[in-house]
Regions:
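Non-heme di-metal
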Residues: 2-360
């Protein structure tokens, strides 16, 4: 079987004969013009509007109590705070760059390009949020940004994330299967790598309420926009380019990627909590493996780990309690309502937009 190389789109392709309504996720030949009303990926514009509606700004979050309480934190919790903050800064810095420098070059549907551009903006905003926390709360800002140079576990965790994304750089030109794996990597970062750090901040909310509130907004962006975005990008690309069948090679490599990052995340989350927050290694393992299974489920891959009951898992409960209600719930309703509105037009909304099952 011949290897099909991925097509890098032109900025403006005036020779294109491709109709706007024929745009594909990968392998297309677009002219580069964004037409929201003629996009064949019916989920793309509603997701874009959802991202717009979720706009928020880091300086709106009150962190005054955190400034006072940071110096009073037990040393173990303060160390965990610094480590997790440093790691999240790296995640979103990498994500901001790779979305525009790598992924978006090979996505050939203009409206989906717009969604990815909006996500990159949100990732940059998340990095700004962490900067606010590092500069206004922590005692040594430069130390936070350079902590990976001094902590081996943090260095290894950051390297694992970077290595996962290097799939696009293994050859001079990536193949279409490489692009699929890059989509998987994005889903892994959003759904598997971030949650451990998020629940750490939720667990110290009574001491650091502003930090927890900031993370809640970031978590809402990831859960309500970024996870369904790459879920739909991957599944649509499989349908459009691979006749609805995920290539076995992609399944095998995706499983290795997910499994490797799951192990790295369990090790990292165990390291930064050190049992100080009442999280046992078993509790962490079950939670992270369930997140890995969620990645598989959303991408229609076979599950990697046994399905377990999560109702009483404290990490899962922490995350869902903070995503339920308030702004995040209202944004979910907005998204559902707008999806219905778009369905009244010519868009086929009978697609899986991605959602959070609050009762799992």
């Amino acid at each position: 079987m011949s290897i099909k190389l991925a097509v890098k789109k032109a900025i403006y392709n005036y020779d294109s004969a491709e109709k706007l309504e024929d745009a594909k996720i990968i392998g297309g030949n677009p002219n580069g013009i964004i037409s929201y009303n003629q996009c064949p990926q019916a989920w793309a514009y509603p997701l874009y509007k959802n991202m717009e509606d979720r706009t928020w700004f880091p300086r709106q979050i009150n962190i005054s109590k955190d400034k006072v309480n940071y110096s009073k934190l037990p040393e173990e919790i303060k160390q965990g705070y610094d480590l997790v903050l440093s790691q999240l800064i790296t995640n979103d810095s990498i994500q901001t760059n790779q979305l525009m420098d790598s992924i978006n070059q090979y996505v050939t549907s203009p409206v989906v390009n717009a969604c990815l551009s909006h996500q990159a903006l949100e990732e940059a905003r998340h990095a700004e949020s962490y900067a606010v926390m590092a500069e206004d709360i922590c005692q040594d800002t430069n130390r936070i940004y350079e902590l990976y140079k001094h902590d081996e576990e943090l260095f290894l965790k950051n390297k694992a994330v970077a290595d996962m994304y290097n799939i696009l750089y293994q050859g001079a030109t990536p193949t279409e299967k490489d692009i699929l794996l890059a989509f998987v990597a994005n889903q892994v970062l959003e759904e598997l790598v971030f949650p451990g750090g998020f629940v750490f901040f939720y667990s110290i909310e009574q001491y650091m309420p502003g930090s927890s509130a900031m993370i809640k907004e970031i978590n809402g962006d990831e859960t309500l926009s970024h996870v369904p975005l790459f879920q739909n990008i991957f599944n649509t690309a499989i349908k459009e380019t691979f006749n609805g069948i995920i290539p076995e090679e992609v399944v095998e490599k995706a499983h290795r990627m997910i499994g490797h990052m799951c192990e790295a995340e369990i090790k990292w989350t165990t390291y930064v909590t050190k049992g100080i927050l009442g999280f046992s290694e078993h509790t962490i393992k079950v939670f992270i493996e369930s997140q890995a299974n969620s990645v598989c489920k959303n991408l229609k891959l076979p599950l990697l780990y046994p399905v377990v009951e999560l109702k009483d898992n404290p990490l899962r409960k922490l995350m869902l309690d903070h995503l339920k209600g308030g702004e995040v719930e209202s944004k979910t309703m907005f998204f559902e309502e707008n999806a219905t509105e778009y369905a009244k037009g010519n868009l086929d909304m009978n697609v899986d937009l991605g959602s959070v099952n609050w009762d799992d």
